[in-house]
Amino acid sequence: MNVDTQLSRDGLYSSLRTRYKVYISMHAFAIWHRFISFLAIYLWPCIMGSVNLNLQDRENEYFFDSIQYIIYTSELLVGDHELQRSHHEEQPSLVYPSSSFSSTSKFWRYFAYLLSLQIVIDFVLYKLSSAMASLHYLKFVKIIALSYICFSSLIRICHCWTYFIRIMGLSSLNKFVNLLHDFETTSNRVYSQICELEANSAANRSRLMDFLPANDPLLFNLTEQNTLSYELSGLYEKLLPRYQLVLSRIYPYAAASNLRNLLSLYRLPNCFGKLNSFDLRKGSSTSLKRSSMYLARKENQDFDDQSTQILNHIKTAYYELTIISKQVLCCILSFPVDSFLAERSSWLIVHREVGDLSNALSVSMVRLVDILKFSVESVNRNQHNTTSKPFPRIMCKENLRSLFNELHSVMMETHESISSYIQEGDNTAMQTYAMDEYDQVGLLLKDLLSEWDFNRALLLNLQHMHRKRK
């Protein structure tokens, strides 16, 4: 009886102790659950942000500020938007980015900071749960902590992969806009030198064409402008299909509303249709002409028709490249950031397509640099021939004498033809007209002689003053 009583007491005591442990464990679990809920609701967003597949709003702003900063600093969209005007009327839909988000290295360091913070938190949580698990009724805490760490690691892996593809796309974009900037600068230099050759050709063509031999360097320089013009426009035309291909592949990933606002903001033509296709010439705007390419050497507008057509051909080809490159950048700026899968696809396509376009642009830059070197040599040779040897054959006495002999022969032939025409006396009106024309030629010759007398007197005066100074 005593033995049975002792056994029943031990069983009851063991049962009560087990129930007490269960109660304590449930109470501890409730307290721990409240602590985790408080941490997730109030403290966790302040430390790491919301735990989901989407990135934090600050990270999204950080990334797009980096893109905008790259584009703005490359001067590809500066001056072609309506931010200044809309600032006084209403809040603009796009603001200037901050220079603190100016490089992919800062963006990567920011992510490394978040990743390090996550590792430290996971380590502290693991150590704390291991210490609490030493108590028999808190062993489940370690299981909860390990489950949370695994889930957090999975989220961080997705986060890391998103950062990685974003940084790849950002690096490709950075390389692309830098190449665009170099391409534009080199193109403007070539264009300015072509205009300089054109100006020299227009000034010298009428005076040189009749008196210089065919193998003279000055006459040879007159044809170099045409060669450079066709080389440059041909280079632009080869790049245009590659730009169009990249634009057609990037456009489906852009948010329609964001893209529409950006095209309106930068006054770009909305060439995109419902079938993910576009027409470059639809709604083209003349307000997007680059000042350096379209207003360079504005004073030289008196070219002949052939040269003007060549220069206009260059400007048209470059204008199309400028429009479509801005549309590519606007498509990238309008990418939505709403899911991991969408971002993975969009930024991978940016990394691949924009990277390929950058490679094609690099190859074109090599050819453009060759054209630039040739244009520099042409301009230097033209300047050397026109300054160091200013019209050597025209200014010599023999050439001047032959020129006046030809002029004298023409005047004598005209005099004889008019005198014979007057002697016939068939048409009085035609005789009067012929005499008027003859008188006008004489007046021009008198003006030329008067100008020669004036210039000769001026030269004599300068010579006299120079002798006095000595």
Curated annotation (Swiss-Prot):
What keyword terms does UniProt attach to this protein? Glycoprotein, Membrane, Peroxisome, Receptor, Transmembrane, Transmembrane helix
Q: What is its main location?
A: membrane
Q: Where are the annotated glycans? A: N204, N221, N385
**Keyword Hydrolase part of the UniProt annotation:** no
- UniProt topology in membrane: Multi-pass membrane protein
The question of whether Membrane is a record keyword is answered with: yes
Biological process (GO) annotations held by this record are: peroxisome inheritance
Family the entry assigns? Belongs to the INP2 family.
Name of the featured protein: Inheritance of peroxisomes protein 2
UniProt lists the gene as inp2
